[in-house]
Amino acid sequence: MKLLTLLSHLPGFWVHHGGNPDIVALEMDSRRVASGSLFFCLKGFTVDGHDFAEEAVARGAAAIVAERPLSVDVPVVLVSDSRRAMAILADAFYGRPTHRLHLIGVTGTNGKTTTTSIIEQIARKTGKKTGLIGTVHIKVGDRSYPAANTTPESLILQRTFKQMVDEGVEFVAMEVSSHALHQGRVHGCDYDVAVFTNLTQDHLDYHGTMEEYRNAKGLLFAQLGNRYDERRPKFAVLNHDDPVSQYYKHMTAAPIVTYGMREKSDVMAEQIRMTAGGMAFRLCTPHGSAAVETKLVGSFNVYNILAAAAACLASGFSLETIAAALADVEPVPGRFETVDEGQNFTIIVDYAHTPDSLENALKTVRQLAKRNVYVVIGCGGDRDPSKRPLMAQVAVRYADVAIFTSDNPRSEDPKQILRDMEAGVSAEIGKHVTIPDREEAIRYAIGQAQEGDVVLIAGKGHETYQIIGNDVIEFDDRAVARAAVKERG
């Protein structure tokens, strides 16, 4: 594609050093640049892509997209925001692939990963070839790849959508993070259904205030329904029990489907009960009601199921199809995942890393425990420090014993993070133990547990690494827990 043909899709730019070269690839990593590439200079938190423009040209870049003039001998496309320009141009370069997919986007603080997984599994049960983009992995049909971010950069995202289209995928569920929405990574994505799970405190290190965080999430609904196509009606699926839904309701032009358990909603759950294999309840919808059995547990998972069911109903699936598929839905790795080595107590690994998600997990654990509840919990470094005392307060309030430890401290001092946590529970000093080393903390909890107890290891879930300083070391809560049980005998 000629450079100027590609740029015709982009508003507001100026080209320094004229020319109209052929563009055969788009790249944002200078190490991947080859002859004929269009290289995007992106500003990161620690690295500025503008510093790698000369390297990109030396590797064969035919043109550069940048936010400031550069001394290179190829056309430089000057824009106000390289990330947003990349999203627009990637969508155009790859042929607007989302226009050929049924695309469901899920946003919210908690529940995105499980909700998208349920949606994808329901669609797959109907015989559709599906795709999934999220925190744990990216799936294209039956193949999966590790995910670097909850929502990839737009270039990777559109490249993945193009791959999905080429391989016959027709239905995609994806997580949409507030960072991705704020940075314009999903600009150009043509969503058919947008789903809101909930909004609680998280990512204030990035957004600054809850209002800004709320507004960023709302961008998904603001762009929904902007392109009318009677053959592809669009829907917003909102959690009626979360008051933020009232705000999002006024941000979208699309029809709204509500779900909930407390407020009267379009999609609801009634007669919820725990079973030996999970949960059972009555799924009530405008299309009638159906009995549902699921391997998932916890009220938070009822919400995830309701969100997924509402999205699938809006996508045209029948109630009977959805109810039947829910019986076979498998839990997501690291989301309330049980570690079973034959011990006479329960070990659960969960990704809960916000005060709200930790509270929900501990409330569910309390229902399962015959005796004491232990929780191993830490807080991530270089992230919102204001939630650290809140996490600690939740831990000591709902567990019999809380063990404070490291999560991913990143560039911060792990001991300072723990001091921030301890500051929230000074009046309840007897209910917690601080063990900075995460492996030791897990071993301590498992060593203390007796028959009928539950040990909840929270915060990292599916992650198989720990970030300490600039080092990424191999670490898996589940593997550590298994080893601790075996050593205990």
From Swiss-Prot:
Transmembrane segments: none annotated. One of its GO terms (biological process) is regulation of cell shape. The modification N6-carboxylysine is found at K217. ATP binds at G108, T109, N110, G111, K112, T113, T114. Its EC number is 6.3.2.13. The keyword Cell cycle applies. It is found in: Cytoplasm. One of its GO terms (cellular component) is cytoplasm. Carboxylation is probably crucial for Mg(2+) binding and, consequently, for the gamma-phosphate positioning of ATP. Its cofactor is Mg(2+). Meso-2,6-diaminopimelate binds at R383, D407, N408, P409, R410, G459, E463. GO terms for molecular function: ATP binding; magnesium ion binding; UDP-N-acetylmuramoylalanyl-D-glutamate-2,6-diaminopimelate ligase activity. UDP-N-acetyl-alpha-D-muramoyl-L-alanyl-D-glutamate binds at S30, N149, T150, T151, S177, Q183, R185. It is an enzyme of class 6 (ligase). Catalyzes the addition of meso-diaminopimelic acid to the nucleotide precursor UDP-N-acetylmuramoyl-L-alanyl-D-glutamate (UMAG) in the biosynthesis of bacterial cell-wall peptidoglycan. Belongs to the MurCDEF family. MurE subfamily. This is UDP-N-acetylmuramoyl-L-alanyl-D-glutamate--2,6-diaminopimelate ligase. It comes from Geobacillus kaustophilus (strain HTA426). The gene is murE.
